[in-house]
Swiss-Prot record:
InterPro entries: DnaJ_domain, HscB, HscB_C_sf, HscB_oligo_C, J_dom_sf. One of its GO terms (biological process) is protein complex oligomerization. It comes from Acinetobacter baumannii (strain ATCC 17978 / DSM 105126 / CIP 53.77 / LMG 1025 / NCDC KC755 / 5377). This is Co-chaperone protein HscB homolog. HAMAP family: HscB. Gene3D superfamilies: DnaJ domain, HscB, C-terminal domain. Keywords: Chaperone. It holds the Pfam family DnaJ. Belongs to the HscB family. Residues 2-69 form the J domain. The gene is hscB. Interacts with HscA and stimulates its ATPase activity.
């Protein structure tokens, strides 16, 4: 049984994330180790459910998993050789490093999301045409942008923490 079947979803890049979450919670309840007669087996199943959910939750890992189902997921850890992409990626990273406001981070998030949306469209075409080399390259780029999104989340959290914190020395 593949991850999509586990959550009763179509084998596709575009899935209903609300259904994924709902089915995940239902399966977690069903296979919770504290409620099972065979706790070891339930623990294994629960771990599989968690891993499948994590894989399908993000578009980059979902795309990589689709390639794995077609046995086309080899060399996904290779570096990206597209010079123009690498140049744009470096500029994005620099912008993130220099971001000092939540507004700047929001703008950056929108830009990254636009890149991701374009790459999702590319992946769908590559996948449907079975252009596996291009599909793998697109997954590498999706992974990069997913990491940037994660870093934007961290930067936003850090900004919020900085705004909420106060200097104890000022009070004494």
């Amino acid at each position: 049984m593949n991850h999509f079947e586990l959550f009763n979803l179509p084998v596709a890049l575009d899935i209903d994330l609300a259904s994924l979450k709902s089915n995940f919670l239902s399966l977690q309840q069903q296979y919770h180790p504290d409620k099972a007669a065979d706790k070891d087996q339930a623990l294994i199943k629960s771990s599989e459910i968690n891993q499948a959910f994590k894989t399908l939750s993000q578009v980059d890992s979902r795309a990589a998993y689709l390639l794995a189902l077609k046995k086309q997921d080899h060399h996904l850890d290779q570096s990206i050789s597209d010079f123009e992409f690498l140049q744009s990626a470096l500029e994005l990273r620099e912008q993130l490093d220099e971001a000092t406001s939540s507004e700047h981070l929001r703008t950056l998030r929108l830009e990254v999301q636009q890149w991701i949306d374009g790459l999702v469209r590319e992946f769908k075409i590559d996948y449907s045409e079975e252009d596996w080399a291009e599909a793998r390259d697109t997954v590498r780029k999706l992974r990069f942008f997913q990491r940037v999104l994660n870093d934007i989340d961290k930067a936003e959290d850090q900004l919020l923490d900085d705004e909420d914190s106060f200097d104890l020395d000022d009070d004494f």
